[in-house]
C-alpha cells in the first residue's frame, strides 16, 4: 500500500555530524558518502526514501554535497552538535513542527515515523527502543526555541538535557533493529545485511524504498 505523503510537517535530515567513530583502515570516513543498497551514498538513500513519506525533505549539513537537494547549511564550522541544525531549521523554515532524523538511522520504518508525527501536543516527541532513547528520531515544535536559544548561549550541547527539561515524551517501540545507528563500520555492515534480507522478502516489508 502506498504511504500517504505527510504534507504539513517538513523533514530535516541531520547530516552535519563528525563521523569520528566511523573508521576504515584507521582513517575516519564521512559515512554520509558510504554506498547503501543501489544508491551511491547513505545521504542519497535517506533523502530518496524520506521523499516517499514527506512532501518536503531538507538536508542539514556543514556543506552542500553533489546530491541535488535543498540544504540548510550549519554555519558553526568547528562545532559539532545537532542542536545547531535544529535551531537553524526552525529559524529558516518558520514552521510550527519539524521532524528530525539523523542520517545514520536508515532502518526506521515509515510506520514508526508516522506514529511520531501524529503526536503533536509536546515540544519534543522522540523514539525510544528497548535499550535506548533516540533523540534524533523526533518531532519538534517551535515552542522549544526559547530553551534552545538558552542552551546554545550557555554552550550546553547535551541534547538529553534540553529534551528532559522540556515538554517532551518518549514513544516506545519494540524493535531495536530499526533504530540501529551507523556509528561504526560494523554497524554499517549490519545495516547492509538487514536491508539485503529485506530485499529478499524475509523481513522489513515496510522499511525499504
Swiss-Prot record:
Enzyme class: transferase
Residues that coordinate or bind Mg(2+): 104
Localisation: Cytoplasm
GO cellular component term of the entry, any: cytoplasm
Pfam family name, one: NTP_transf_3
Matches recorded under SUPFAM superfamilies: Nucleotide-diphospho-sugar transferases
Functional description taken from the UniProt entry: Transfers a GMP moiety from GTP to Mo-molybdopterin (Mo-MPT) cofactor (Moco or molybdenum cofactor) to form Mo-molybdopterin guanine dinucleotide (Mo-MGD) cofactor.
Keyword tags: Cytoplasm, GTP-binding, Magnesium, Metal-binding, Molybdenum cofactor biosynthesis, Nucleotide-binding, Transferase
Catalyzed reaction equations: Mo-molybdopterin + GTP + H(+) = Mo-molybdopterin guanine dinucleotide + diphosphate
Listed GO MF terms: GTP binding; metal ion binding; molybdenum cofactor guanylyltransferase activity
Subunit structure: Monomer.
GO terms of biological process kind: bis(molybdopterin guanine dinucleotide)molybdenum biosynthetic process
Principal location: cytoplasm
UniProt protein name: Molybdenum cofactor guanylyltransferase
Amino acid at each position: 500500500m502506498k504511504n500517504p505523503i505527510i504534507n504539513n510537517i517538513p523533514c530535516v535530515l541531520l547530516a552535519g555530524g563528525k563521523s569520528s567513530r566511523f573508521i576504515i583502515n584507521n582513517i575516519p570516513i564521512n559515512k554520509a558518502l558510504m554506498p547503501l543498497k543501489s544508491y551511491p551514498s547513505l545521504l542519497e538513500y535517506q533523502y530518496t526514501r524520506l521523499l516517499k513519506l514527506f512532501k518536503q525533505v531538507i538536508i542539514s549539513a556543514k556543506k552542500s554535497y553533489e546530491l541535488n537537494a535543498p540544504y540548510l547549511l550549519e554555519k558553526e564550522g568547528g562545532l559539532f552538535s545537532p542542536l545547531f541544525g535544529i535551531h537553524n531549521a526552525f529559524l529558516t523554515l518558520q514552521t510550527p513542527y519539524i521532524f528530525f532524523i539523523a542520517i545514520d538511522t536508515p532502518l526506521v520504518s515509515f510506520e514508526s515515523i508516522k506514529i511520531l508525527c501524529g503526536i503533536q501536543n509536546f515540544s519534543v516527541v522522540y523514539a525510544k527502543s528497548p535499550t535506548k532513547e533516540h533523540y534524533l528520531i523526533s518531532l519538534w515544535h517551535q515552542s522549544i526555541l526559547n530553551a534552545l536559544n538558552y542552551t546554545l548561549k550557555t554552550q550546553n550541547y547535551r541534547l538529553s538535557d534540553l529534551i528532559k527539561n522540556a515538554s517532551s515524551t518518549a514513544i516506545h517501540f519494540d524493535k531495536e533493529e530499526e533504530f540501529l545507528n551507523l556509528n561504526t563500520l560494523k554497524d554499517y555492515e549490519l545495516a547492509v545485511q538487514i536491508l539485503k534480507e529485506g530485499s529478499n522478502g524475509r523481513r522489513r516489508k515496510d522499511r525499504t524504498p
